[in-house]
A protein has these predicted regions:
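Phosphate-handling active-site elements
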Residues: 32-42, 68-89
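An acidic intrinsically disordered interaction segment
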Residues: 19-36, 108-111
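Short glycine/serine- and small hydrophobic-enriched flexible loop segments
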Residues: 27-31, 66-73, 142-146
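Polybasic, low-complexity association/targeting segments
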Residues: 1-16
């Protein structure tokens, strides 16, 4: 288990439940990729639960998309090229995520309509988020970190030998 996965677990599984999926993913990726203000999760606050509990795209993916954009903007001087490369990384991430979990939509992944009355509370009480959502965060952090390293935008930390999720066959 990598340091990044341990950090994600520390944040996501904390009893205070202070950070959601998108926030944890953004924080951990910002730390892993050496981005400034790594502890700032505020851009991802409303992205948890598939964007404001709407059940849309998984917060782990949207948090990773924010990190990918920040990273591309830091590494590539040309704004158009940075956007293209950030999109490419996120598209690869989403393809692998879909192959691994069957969907990228929170509603399908969780089986809950988190925006409906009582559903978020039921989702939290059921506790499967501690396993299922955690696995999705772990996959996303590992995969985007790997893709960033492949692109030459990040180096593996000393002593960190990550288990890289497989790339799905195309």
């Amino acid at each position: 288990m990598t340091d990044h996965v341990l950090r994600a677990r520390e944040l996501f599984l904390d009893d205070t439940n202070a950070y959601g999926c998108a926030e944890v993913t953004l924080i951990v990726l910002q730390e892993a990729l050496g981005l400034p203000d790594a502890g700032d999760s505020s851009p991802a606050m409303a992205l948890n639960g598939g964007i404001a509990y709407s059940g849309g795209t998984c917060g782990a993916i949207t948090g990773a998309a924010l990190a990918a954009g920040r990273l591309a903007g830091r590494c590539l001087a040309d704004h158009s090229e940075a956007k293209r490369e950030a999109r490419r990384l996120v598209q690869e991430l989403m393809a692998g995520f879909r192959a691994e979990f069957g969907s990228v939509d929170c509603r399908h992944l969780t089986g809950y309509d988190l925006d409906a009355p009582g559903q978020h509370e039921a989702f939290i009480a059921d506790g499967t988020w501690r396993v299922n959502c955690m696995r999705q965060i772990e996959y996303t952090v590992g995969r985007l970190t790997h893709l960033a390293r492949e692109a030459g935008w990040a180096s593996p930390p000393a002593g960190d030998s990550p288990t890289v999720p497989p790339v799905p066959a195309r």
